[in-house]
């Protein structure tokens, strides 16, 4: 069999989903946890048009908020915070101990910090003149830590 490396800068959504599925299968097998679930909320106007969404997942006692968006015309009205609060509560209800999110400095790191997230890392110059900030929030303190501080 001959394999070829092919340049593809236009993967389809189905191809990206297939890659993510393979990552999940590998990671789940590696740690013996197959409890991954998508987690998402959408806000729609009275015509059914989506004006905001929060999407991510829970898996192996953690959660990641991968995407948060509110239409520009609806920003500043508390919709992003409502989406974030719903996402956090659902993750907590599923037993996630921690939740993390990445936010550029020109997006919403302040909103996450007001909601109790703490900065864990900041990548300056990502992109040039800006930073990519990783934030994390502890949802459930672990009781089986053998004296190791698990809070963030």
Residue positions per predicted region:
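Conserved beta-hairpin
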Residues: 36-54
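Conserved GNAT acetyl-CoA-binding A-motif
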Residues: 91-104
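Conserved active-site tyrosine of GNAT-family acetyltransferases
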Residues: 19, 112, 117
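Conserved beta-strand in the GNAT
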Residues: 49-57, 62-69
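Conserved N-terminal entry element of GNAT/NAT acetyltransferase domains
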Residues: 1-11, 141-152
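Conserved acetyl-CoA pyrophosphate-binding loop and the N-cap/start of the following alpha-helix
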Residues: 74, 78-86
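Conserved catalytic-core motifs of GNAT/GCN5-like acyltransferases
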Residues: 100-102, 118-136
């Amino acid at each position: 069999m001959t394999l070829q490396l092919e340049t593809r800068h236009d993967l389809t959504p189905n191809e990206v989903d297939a890659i993510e599925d393979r990552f999940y299968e590998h990671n789940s097998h590696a740690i013996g946890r197959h409890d991954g679930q998508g987690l998402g909320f959408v806000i729609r106007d009275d015509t059914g048009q989506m004006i905001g969404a929060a999407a991510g997942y829970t898996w192996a006692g953690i959660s990641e908020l991968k995407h948060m968006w509110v239409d520009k015309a609806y920003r500043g009205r508390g919709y992003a915070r409502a989406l974030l609060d719903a996402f956090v509560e659902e993750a907590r209800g599923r037993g996630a101990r921690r939740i993390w999110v990445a936010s550029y400095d020109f997006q919403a790191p302040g909103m996450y910090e007001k909601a109790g997230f703490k900065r864990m890392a900041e990548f300056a110059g990502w992109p040039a003149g800006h930073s990519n900030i990783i934030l994390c929030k502890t949802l459930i303190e672990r009781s089986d830590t053998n004296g190791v501080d698990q809070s963030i």
